[in-house]
């Protein structure tokens, strides 16, 4: 029996390690070469003949124990607790925000040495938004830096609610509260030169950044009476509102805006219970609060506040404060001009704030009896004008005759914008020919006013200034002028779409009826008038009077047809008419307006009208322009119709 073969040992699939366990020698570490860790000498040192030394007491990599905690503590003391360490470790704050917070804390420490920045958590608004959406800080971080952590309620609350939490008051708000307390009780506030500099800086920031878009305060009088009227609560409330808006528009003091807003709102509510008649300062303070809410809060809240301001204006009757006579020698020009400018700022606020959602206006144009404001230079000098400014309706009626200051021009354009918005509302309700005719008359009148003002404004020194170097109000006035032209065009397009949606059958029936009336009962009268066009007089009696009555009746019929058929009317309405009928319709419609120089009549016309001198487009339709000029009609009938695509 054959003997079984012994199984051969299988080779291991794993190759031996290229390196021995242990540490690399110092020579290999120095040369950054791979060390095989052979004993007593590695292969690299054996080949080069170097001494192979292994250091078994090498220190561990990374920072030393307690070094990270020390760095966190130094960072927290450096920025005075203005950053949350969890957001900083997560990379949710930029270097710019860190530096901004650092500068603000250093200024507070310089101006107010008794104020402890580490005594309560402080966060910027952008930091709060990121902290709400960012990850929570780890327990280790909270244990390491407890003074940098804010309470959960403060992290989740918004800016207004966070200011109401029991925490130490910021120095600017504390100083403002002292001034308001002095206005209530008459006790002198604590003098602090450092905080006085901050408040003076906020006052100057207001006139640099807020006043150009809301120019209703006289700068010199306000700054000179800052200390003299500190005991008046309304004046202190206005100053607080000014600093609130100025802080909101400044990156340096933005963190104080919410606290100032809450303090100002409380005083405004207190004034409502004290003042029986709203004062001018109270109205100005509420108007600035509405401006702040529009910048920093929801739009609905700003609408509620500005509506309250409008009611205060109506209670104080600012809209009719100008007397019918000229200002006397004993009148205060600055106070009167501040009253006018306060009303006009609120008026423009009403026009543009409600135009976004097309809400009705609160301050109606018909109830205004107050003059337009003078130029900014005449107001700040102050220098009363030799001739008083026009009223609003006078300035609109004299469009194209004289230029106005930028603020006054801005008010007129805001009024025209409001009229255009009302015209758009009426365009959505067009259903009859009479309504359509009235709409286009109003549209044409508005277009003429805007065209005249645009032509005159383009040559004024304010309009020729580059927008980059111009003040904000002048730049916005130039943009508003161009926007108003575009808005009028869109309103006209809305009306065309509304008229185009009318029943086509109804248009054709009215057109058939109008053409039949012209072709039967009035055809002889029209031809008779045409043959005696050179000697025809509408005002004569006898046969001429009979012809005049027939012409007027036919013109009314033709005008009714044209009003139904114009502006994107179906072409079929004209195809049922003969060439002579359309020609008679046009001439009859012109004779209804003998006093007009010209008018624009846009209609979709069939291609066969090309033989009357009308340019026809590629699609076979063109837009004609009928010019009502008596002399041209008598000389040549063909010049009564001009073609425009």
Swiss-Prot record:
Residues 113-131 have a biased composition (Basic and acidic residues). Keywords: DNA-binding, Metal-binding, Nucleus, Transcription, Transcription regulation. InterPro entries: TF_fung (IPR050815), Transcription_factor_dom_fun (IPR007219), Zn2-C6_fun-type_DNA-bd_sf (IPR036864), Zn2Cys6_DnaBD (IPR001138). Its main location: nucleus. GO terms for biological process: DNA-templated transcription. Gene3D superfamilies: Zn(2)-C6 fungal-type DNA-binding domain. GO terms for cellular component: nucleus. Residues 1-21, 113-170 are annotated as: Disordered. Transcription factors AN6788 and AN6790 act in tandem to regulate the expression of the non-reducing polyketide synthase pkfA from the aspernidine A biosynthesis cluster. They do not control the expression of the other genes involved in aspernidine A biosynthesis, nor do they regulate the expression of the highly reducing polyketide synthase AN6791 and the esterase AN6793 with which they are predicted to form a secondary metabolite biosynthesis cluster. This is Transcription factor AN6788. It comes from Emericella nidulans (strain FGSC A4 / ATCC 38163 / CBS 112.46 / NRRL 194 / M139).
């Amino acid at each position: 029996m054959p003997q079984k073969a012994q199984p051969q040992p299988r080779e291991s699939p794993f190759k031996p390690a290229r390196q021995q366990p242990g540490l690399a020698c110092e020579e290999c570490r120095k040369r950054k070469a791979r060390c095989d860790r052979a004993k007593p000498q590695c292969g690299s040192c054996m080949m080069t003949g170097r001494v192979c030394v292994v250091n078994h007491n090498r220190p561990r990599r990374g920072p030393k124990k307690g070094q990270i905690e020390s760095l966190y503590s130094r960072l927290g003391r450096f920025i005075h607790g203005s950053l949350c360490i969890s957001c900083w470790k997560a990379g949710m704050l930029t270097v710019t925000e860190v530096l901004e917070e650092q500068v603000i804390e250093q200024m507070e420490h310089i101006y107010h040495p008794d104020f402890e920045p580490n005594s309560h958590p402080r966060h910027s608004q952008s930091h709060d938004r990121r902290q709400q959406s960012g990850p929570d800080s780890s327990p280790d971080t909270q244990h390491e830096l407890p003074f940098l952590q804010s309470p959960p309620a403060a992290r989740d609350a918004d800016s207004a609610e966070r200011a109401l939490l029991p925490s130490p008051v910021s120095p600017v708000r504390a100083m403002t509260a002292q001034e308001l307390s002095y206005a209530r009780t008459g006790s002198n506030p604590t003098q602090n030169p450092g905080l006085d500099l901050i408040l003076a800086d906020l006052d100057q920031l207001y006139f640099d950044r807020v006043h150009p878009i809301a120019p209703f305060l006289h700068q010199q009088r306000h700054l000179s009476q800052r200390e003299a009227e500190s005991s008046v609560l309304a004046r202190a409330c206005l100053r607080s509102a000014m600093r609130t808006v100025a802080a909101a528009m400044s990156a340096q003091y933005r963190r104080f805006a919410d606290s100032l807003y809450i303090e100002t709102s409380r005083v405004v509510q207190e004034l409502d219970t004290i003042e029986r008649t709203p004062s001018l300062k109270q109205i100005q303070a509420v108007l600035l609060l509405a401006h702040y809410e529009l910048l920093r809060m929801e739009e609905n809240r700003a609408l509620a506040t500005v509506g309250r301001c409008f009611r205060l204006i109506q209670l104080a009757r600012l809209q009719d404060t100008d007397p019918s006579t000229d200002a006397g020698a004993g009148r205060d020009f600055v106070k009167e001009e501040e009253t006018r400018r306060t009303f006009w700022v609120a008026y423009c606020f009403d026009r543009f704030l409600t135009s976004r959602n097309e809400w009705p206006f609160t301050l109606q144009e018909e109830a205004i009896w107050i003059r337009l404001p003078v130029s900014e230079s005449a107001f700040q000098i102050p220098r009363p004008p030799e001739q008083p400014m026009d009223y609003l309706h006078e300035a609109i009626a004299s469009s194209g005759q004289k230029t106005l200051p930028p603020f006054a021009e801005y008010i007129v354009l805001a009024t025209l914008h409001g009229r255009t918005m009302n015209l758009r509302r009426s365009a959505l309700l067009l259903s009859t020919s009479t309504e359509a005719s009235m709409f286009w008359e109003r549209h044409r009148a508005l277009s003429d006013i805007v065209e005249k003002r645009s032509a005159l404004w383009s040559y004024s020194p304010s309009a020729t200034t580059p927008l980059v170097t111009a003040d904000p109000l002048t730049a916005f006035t130039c943009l508003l002028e161009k926007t108003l032209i575009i808005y009028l065009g869109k309103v006209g397009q809305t009306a065309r779409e509304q008229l185009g949606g009318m029943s086509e059958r109804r248009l054709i029936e009215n057109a058939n009826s109008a053409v039949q009336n012209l072709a039967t009962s009035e055809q002889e009268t029209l031809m008779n008038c045409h043959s005696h066009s050179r000697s025809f007089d509408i005002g004569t009696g006898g046969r001429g009077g009979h012809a005049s009555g027939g012409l007027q009746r036919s013109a009314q019929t033709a005008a009714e047809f044209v009003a139904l058929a114009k502006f994107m009317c179906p072409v079929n309405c004209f195809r049922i008419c003969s060439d002579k009928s359309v020609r008679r319709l046009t001439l009859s419609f012109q004779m209804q307006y003998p006093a007009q120089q010209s008018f624009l009549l846009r209609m979709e016309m069939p291609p066969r009208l090309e033989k009357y001198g009308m340019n026809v487009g590629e699609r076979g339709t063109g837009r004609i322009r009928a010019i009502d000029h008596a002399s041209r009609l008598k000389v040549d009938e063909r010049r009564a119709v001009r073609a425009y695509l």
